[in-house]
């Protein structure tokens, strides 16, 4: 399981890569592995407002449908349109294939997220509970 050290993570298995005041958001390797083959990604529209901890979209796999939560609040400035026709790209490389880019309205939201080490610990606890 890959957990890049330069990203932030949420307890609900989303990742955040920050560049300036923008946040790229996707789901983690752990999440895509648990979901299995991804067949559909429902994404917000550009200019939609997202709340930290609020619903960002839905991801569907052959196993289940799962809500995607926004780790940070802000305005959607871009979506990964490639996922509309090829949602399986998330399975192939979850960290290269973001879901949305958000212009953050409160960079303090990042303080509520996990480091790579803390996220790895969370994943190990969840795996141990199965």
Curated annotation (Swiss-Prot):
InterPro entries: 2-oxoA_DH_lipoyl-BS (IPR003016), Biotin_lipoyl (IPR000089), GCV_H (IPR002930), GCV_H/Fam206 (IPR033753), GCV_H_sub (IPR017453), Single_hybrid_motif (IPR011053). Keywords: Lipoyl. It holds the Pfam family GCV_H. GO terms for biological process: glycine decarboxylation via glycine cleavage system. GO terms for cellular component: cytosol; glycine cleavage complex. It comes from the Bacteria. CDD domains: GCS_H. Its cofactor is (R)-lipoate. The modification N6-lipoyllysine is found at residue 63. Binds 1 lipoyl cofactor covalently. Residues 22-103 form the Lipoyl-binding domain. The glycine cleavage system catalyzes the degradation of glycine. The H protein shuttles the methylamine group of glycine from the P protein to the T protein. The glycine cleavage system is composed of four proteins: P, T, L and H. Belongs to the GcvH family. This is Glycine cleavage system H protein. The lineage of its organism: Bacteria, Bacillati, Bacillota, Clostridia, Eubacteriales.
């Amino acid at each position: 399981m890959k957990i890049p050290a330069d990203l932030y993570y949420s307890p609900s298995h989303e990742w955040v890569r920050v560049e300036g005041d923008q946040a790229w958001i996707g789901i983690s390797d752990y999440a895509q592995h648990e979901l299995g083959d991804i067949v559909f990604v429902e994404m917000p529209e550009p200019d939609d407002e997202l709340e930290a901890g609020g619903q960002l979209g839905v991801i569907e796999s052959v196993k289940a449908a799962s809500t995607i939560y926004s780790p940070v609040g802000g305005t959607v400035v871009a979506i990964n349109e490639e996922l509309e026709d090829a949602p399986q790209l998330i399975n192939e490389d979850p960290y290269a294939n973001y879901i949305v880019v958000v212009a953050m309205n409160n960079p303090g939201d990042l303080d509520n997220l996990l480091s790579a080490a803390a996220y790895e610990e969370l994943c190990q606890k969840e795996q141990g509970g199965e």
